[in-house]
Amino acid sequence: MATERIFVIVGASLAGAKAAETLREEGFDGRIVLLGAEAERPYERPPLSKDYLRGEAEAKPYVHPEPFYAENEIELRTSTTATGIDPSASTVTIGEGERLPYDRLLLTTGAEPRRLPVPGAELEGIHYLRELGNSDAIRDRLTAGARVVVIGAGWIGAEVAASARERDCEVTIVGMASVPLERVLGPEVGAIYRDIHRDHGVRFLGGTGLEAFEGAARVERVRTSSGASIDADLVVVGVGVAPRVELAESAGIEAENGILVNEHLQSSVPGVLAAGDVANAHHPLYGRRIRVEHWANALEQGPAAARSMLDTGVAYDNIPYFFSDQYDVGMEYAGYATSWDEVVFRGDVKGREFIAFWLESGRIVAGMNVNVWDVNERIRALIRSRTPVDAKRLADPDVPLEELALPPGPAGEERSRASAPPQGFLAQGINFAKRFVAARVATPDATPVSELRNGEAKVIGVDGEKVAAYRDGDGTLHAVSAVCTHMGCLVEWNEDEETWDCHCHGSRFEPSGRVINGPAKKDLEQKQL
């Protein structure tokens, strides 16, 4: 009699949850155990510094509705800490000594905020933003007129500052760099973000460190190394994160700036894999290890690791991607640039509608579109091509991006036409990442299904799930999951076509949930109301 296989995932994160989901989608019928130290089930992190922090999204940004795990026979064990791994016995120790056997082990333990060891660090009112509870605590204090000091001028610091200003707080950013985001974007693009924040009333103190927090029981002031004293009702610290590698290291798994894994996300110990923020993975395109701390990487790397667990995986070579919204400025960034020779701008920089490209040895290593949409796939194609480009042509908005990696002349023009992305759906101004996250935290319609009129359709909330409900002209109710089966965006009702459409990638479904056109391949799940 065959023994049931057990796959254990340590880390109830986005990467861990998507890995568990993928295992079932790929046909794994063994036991799946998903362990999470937090009390919450897996959730999305991007909203924690954006619309959820601002109070614009009340719903918690969970990855899956609560019934998902039981329905898919995934043992989700929250408030459960893994304390040890014994590779020789293939067991994970959890809780007070329980040993859980595994056939494959995936570590998605994520990262934790770096703490500031300065005087006053223990005062109340000093917050680090990483978990859902952190965002809740900060949000409660973002009242009009509150004096908020943000320590750190990276992505988290910049987004928290923007969210606080939109809640009418008085905001000061303190950063070691001369401009925000300088380490990632460089001084030229960082200066643009500095000006964006200043235009919205944020005070930026760059080139200075933190000396101490001051106050009685609560923080009252922040003192910088340059001698400035800043009054504060609330402090948010965002000075980077450190990968959680202690569990792996204690088991002899190689780690350096994360758990070291190959392009198949396999660690130095057979049967143990890693994905998400904690994985320092060899990247075939870049020819080196990279560790990526962004949402899209967790979304895509978790499923890739699941396929490797099933021995059906391929090399993970996705180009890193992230997005950010600050005030009325939205951006998408693709690539991985730790060094570059020049930054080339294309478009209206003063009007904040442009694309920036980071070039090294004439090749594009990263690109960022700011308030310009439908171009990120083209940017990624240029990065992946590894072809040297002409900087003057790159800066010229009249030169199609598709042509930039092609030789001049008729042959290049013909190849450009052949390789141009399809028009239509992608030309409608669609920003996948923003739509994906916004949809996941959106509050569904509160209309009871019994009140739907003939010919009416709505996405409604039913027991924590988002359901696409449509009552046809005969009064028959059709209820299906509102989550697109391609990549998890929410569908919307197309009144003209009487279909459920996904505006992330263009999938379309009949009211019954049957796929009309892809990229989705699976029908929407039927729901009984």
Protein language model annotation of sequence segments:
Residues 2-75, 163-184, 378:
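Beta1-alpha1 glycine-rich phosphate/pyrophosphate-binding loop at the start
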Residues 412-497, 514-517, 522-529:
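N-terminal pre-ligand scaffold of iron-sulfur
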Residues 2-6, 25, 278-377, 381, ...:
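Mid-to-C-terminal Rossmann-like scaffold of FAD/NAD(P)H-dependent oxidoreductases
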Residues 29, 76-94, 100, 166-262, ...:
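A Rossmann-like FAD-binding core segment of flavoenzymes
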Residues 11-14, 37, 130-131, 151-156:
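Glycine-rich Rossmann-fold phosphate-binding loop(s) that bind the pyrophosphate
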Residues 122-145, 217-223, 228-304, 391-396, ...:
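FAD-site-proximal beta/loop scaffold in flavoenzymes
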Residues 108-109, 151, 238-239, 250-251, ...:
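Short, well-ordered coil/turn residues at beta-beta hairpins
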